[in-house]
Swiss-Prot record:
Modified residues (Phosphoserine): 20, 575, 1300, 1305, 1320, 1323, 1358, 1361-1362, 1367, 1386
Protein name: Condensin complex subunit 1
Lineage: Eukaryota, Metazoa, Chordata, Craniata, Vertebrata
Modified residues (Phosphothreonine): 1329, 1375, 1380
Family from the record: Belongs to the CND1 (condensin subunit 1) family.
Bipartite nuclear localization signal, short sequence motif: residues: 1332-1353
Residue span of region Interaction with SMC2 and SMC4: 1-593
Region (Disordered): 569-602, 945-966, 1293-1392
Function, as annotated: Regulatory subunit of the condensin complex, a complex required for conversion of interphase chromatin into mitotic-like condense chromosomes. The condensin complex probably introduces positive supercoils into relaxed DNA in the presence of type I topoisomerases and converts nicked DNA into positive knotted forms in the presence of type II topoisomerases. May target the condensin complex to DNA via its C-terminal domain. May promote the resolution of double-strand DNA catenanes (intertwines) between sister chromatids.
Comp. bias intervals (Acidic residues): 1360-1373
Amino acid sequence: MSPHNFEFHLPLSPEELLKSGGVNQYVVREVLPVKHLSSQLRAFQSAFRAQGPLAILEHFDTVYSILHHFRSIEPGLKEDTLEFLKKVVSRHSQELSSILDDAALSGSDRSAHLNALKMNCYALIRLLESFENMTSQTSLIDLDIGGKGKRARAKATLGFDWEEERQPVLQLLTQLLQLDIRHLWNHSAIEEEFVSLVTGCCYRLLENPTISHQKNRSTKEAIAHLLGVALVRYNHMLSATVKIIQMLQHFEHLPPVLVTAVSLWATDYGMKSIVGEIVREIGQKCPQELSRDTAGAKGFAAFLTELAERIPAVLMANMCILLDHLDGENYMMRNAVLAAIAEMVLQVLNGDQLEESARETRDQFLDILQAHGHDVNSFVRSRVLQLFARIVQQKALPLTRFQAVVALAVGRLADKSVLVCKNAIQLLASFLANNPFSCKLSDIDLAGPLQKEIQKLQEMRAQRRSAAATAALDPEEEWDAMLPELKSTLQQLLKLPQEEGDHQIADAETAEEVKGRIRQLLAKASYKQAIVLTREATSHFQESEPFSHTEPEENSFLNLLGLIFKGPEASTQDSHGDTDPGLTGSKDSPSVPEPEGSQSNDELVKQEMLVQYLQDAYGFSQKITEAIGIISKMMYENTTTVVQEVIEFFVMVFQFGVPQALFGVRRMLPLIWSKEPGVREAVLNAYRQLYLNPKGDSARAKAQTLIHNLSLLLVDASVGTIQCLEEILCEFVQKDEVKPAVIQLLWERATEKVPSSPLERCSSVMLLGMMARGKPEIVGSNLDALVRVGLDEKSPQDYRLAQQVCLAIANISDRRKPSLGERHPPFRLPQEHRLFERLQDMVTKGFAHPDPLWIPFKEVAVTLTYQLAESPDVLCAQMLQGCAKQVLEKLEKNATEADPKETAPRLPTFLLMNLLSLAGDVALQQLVHLEQAVSGELGRRRVLREEQEHRAKEPKEKTASSETTMEEELGLVGGATADDTEAELIRSICEKELLDGNQVLAAFVPLLLKVCNNPGLYSNPELCAAASLALGKFCMISAPFCDSQLRLLFTMLEKSSLPTVRSNLMVATGDLAIRFPNLVDPWTPHLYARLRDPAQQVRKTAGLVMTHLILKDMVKVKGQVSEMAVLLIDPVPQIAALAKNFFNELSHKGNAIYNLLPDIISRLSDPEGGVEEEPFHTIMKQLLSYITKDKQTESLVEKLCQRFRTARTERQYRDLAYCMSQLPLTERGLQKMLDNFECFGDKLLDESVFSAFLSIVGKLRRGAKPEGKAIIDEFEQKLRACHTRGMDGIEEFETGQGGSQRALSAKKPSAVSRLQPLTSVDSDNDFVTPKPRRTKPGRPQTQQRKKSQRKAKVVFLSDESSEDELSAEMTEEETPKRTTPIRRASGRRHRS
């Protein structure tokens, strides 16, 4: 067929070219075999060199055959074909530029070039698509091969790197389309198929997910330019719009790619109308359809969001089309529209020079954003807060909106969604960082200047009014000037009742005369008198104008005053009753001409602006203060990200000088112990930022600031706070983040080289001690200086400083038990060291003086002695003997001076208290010393000895006598080699020797028991507290002694009238439960009983102790754990938070809460001892929130349904129904309810029960699948039928009752009322002293657990009045005979 006699039609599929079509339509004559393709391609290349691009007309079959066999041919042939076709199209493009300008071009030549153009483009584009398809398939096969390996596989398959070849092909097509090729077609109208061929190739390339990768950026740009040319020159807009909408719905990787392209078209190609078309198509999408098509909605949302970031001004013209989606169900579309609005506020509607229409548009957009801060979807609320944070950060939020948006953020802090809370905190932090008011935001500091400037403004206005009067102001203008202050005065007076005082209107006075007086008072600015007179006139002249028909409200009253002041002619004028009466209200009113010119007006305006600024700043600081109170409660949330945001917020608030920020900075301290590394690091960063980088001109100035700031944290700090701060400083010191200048200055203050107060010295020693934990040499190298600073004899003695010196010195050694195999013995000081000499002297001399600070000092002194001294028991025995000697001397002296009639000598109470307290401390520390230091040293030496024997080396030099003495004394030279032997030895010493009659400690036991057994005789609260705590410490030593005194301990725990004693004993018994679990286990119910103690202090302590014991598996978790559940509704927030934390931790221990729930529900809904209905709901809502597993839910549903059969009261029915309504039910849970319907069907007559089950139906419907709705409908129908007609078996019962519902059961005592008085808590008959537990042969009865490291701080003060009591010990008849021993094997226990 001659080239001039055929026409090439672009096919829809390659097969069409093989079929005969219309007249003169080109048809492929032969598909060449693979073996001939190389030679035919060479022939095509030769023809191209001779004929140019038109050679394709005769050799198209060769190219078609290559495309047909593309998968079968060699990679080299593919690459040669591609390179050749690129050359052909490039040559044709160059020639067409001159051919198209030739006016004399013949029809046959035009037709030949048109056919060649279509053939060349078709062949090149089909070849491009073939390469692309093969690359995509190779990528799918090699998904597991990443990086270079994947790319190498593709290169091996194709013979070259295709990704580098795409861009040149696309650029070649772009150059071709940029020519005016329309002239090749008749009527200069390019056929649609040709445009579709080129653009379709682009869209297919975009469908490849890898197109969004950074490495394909050049390809994306080439595609965008090619499509841009098609849009501009070939009327492709409609097709592009439809295609873009389709691709957004199906390809999630395309939104950013298409945004880049559309932005390019709108800016570089001037095709802004394409944006309108696309937005119109999206805007016309049905919201209901998008709620089902989540993939499409996601694509549209991402596209709109990024498009708004790129070209907000272009998109803004079409925003009205999108606003309907704000009411749609799909939250992603709402988020996208809101994000677009925010971008317009940021980039288009920002600045102070906006026109009025633009300002109105901005305000409308901000209104929309604020409204969606309360959206039903948490993701939308969160997004709004994020958008406002960006607006604030870029200072695009008008000042008038600050209060409203801050209030929105504060309100969202209480949101149920963690994400919303987190973003609310971030928004408030953005407000702080970008606030226009001040770098220091303190409402206390701002209140004074605000009042001062308000007073100044009032004076300026008064001067202005007086000047205006002399200038004969128009009454209307004068009225406007006085209106704000007049209205303010009126508002204050209207709040007060009208006083019945002296009448100001005489009987003969007329209404006109009174009007004149009112006018004069207003002119003199005597507003209060004028208002009082007018109020009286309205009641006196009820029939006279203008006082008749005046309502006692603000607007009517102002109208009346205005009418009196301005005259009757003002009655037809508009009322000013709605004018803003604020201090800045006159800014917008007409200016009153001043005799002195405009300077006075300018000053007044400036003053009004200043007052407005201070008012805004004051309001802002108040909102921030309110937010601080809410955010501080979020510091212990379970979500790490929220906690981190809270910490960052308080860092920022602290830097802005808000007074309440210090509370938050202190409150974050315990988070240093968090198990979450992110939280711990956030706390360290916060303190690093706040304290380690202070401002100052020199290193010393910075050190002074740092020490001052840290000292503020120590003011009134608790023991827990100090421990947390110590951990943080230890971390900083170990990382060398604390400068040497800081440590140097601390020593100078401690040793008084620089002037410092006693408190400053004390805080310096405390800080040195904290740092010594990280680097012991800080204190160890200056030990003598520290002893001299705090322990030298003074008058009076500073026990607070001495206590801190002891604590600091204690940090120079490791307090942990020595590890086995340690080469060097633990660090200890000789007995003769001056430290112990001074400690012994201060303890014995201070013993005879009633100084309350001596008690905590002697406790740390004894602890330090046992920690650092060689043979500390000898030193402490000397302390005890010295103090006891003073007591005996005092007794002898009193005996000689006492009245002969007295039967027994008296002793000052504080001496007996100090003696018992010291004895208790020594007893406990002796136990710790034996179990840690002595036991650890025995083990260390044994391991070293075993290593020597194992290596069969020559014996080392004989150890020092000081190291062998202990083994000789204990009889271990023969070589006990087992841990059990050493533990048995230590246990034997504790049980048989420490409290033996010949030992020092044993001498104090009779005295201690006498004080504890006779609370009526020894009634001093401090003495009782000290004695009870000392008894608890003595009981820790020996199992036999503990067993003999448990009855006395629990009697005091139950019946002591002093909350301090009960609290201390709760701690003591908790420690005993860990050390001697088998002995204490039968008494566990009495431990639980303290959870309902009437004293807040005792309940809190009991909650802490039981939390520790239960979570550490030290006591059996029984149904009595319901007492812990009751603490969830405790009126004291700290106790309720403690209980919540307990259940949070318990929920992590397997199925613990699930197993306990049935018993808890039974106990709390028990008519005899349960809680009221509302508290029950609160408790169960919290506990049931921990049930998240489907199997647990189903099992609980079945159990609760069965409980309906045994429930006795309607209250119990309601409780069970409520519990079921709180469970996260599934279809299987619903099936369980249907299977057990007869258990509760007859209870549905109760309205509350019925409502609870209806709420279950509502929850099930929300997440139900279509196939599950039938069973839900069936369940609801059964519920309604039983509610209205009852079960088949109860119709006669309903008839007998006359259709009336059963009466509600009487209400039970509230949770608070369960805190019974001490006299009625657990009668004596409830006490049972268990018998000693029988143990298995070969296993000692008193097998002990390792004692807890924690030790309660002694508290001796009590606000409770003491009562004379008789013996606190129970009689033998009260002693129970039952035992409930626990079988425990310490070796098998899993410790958490």
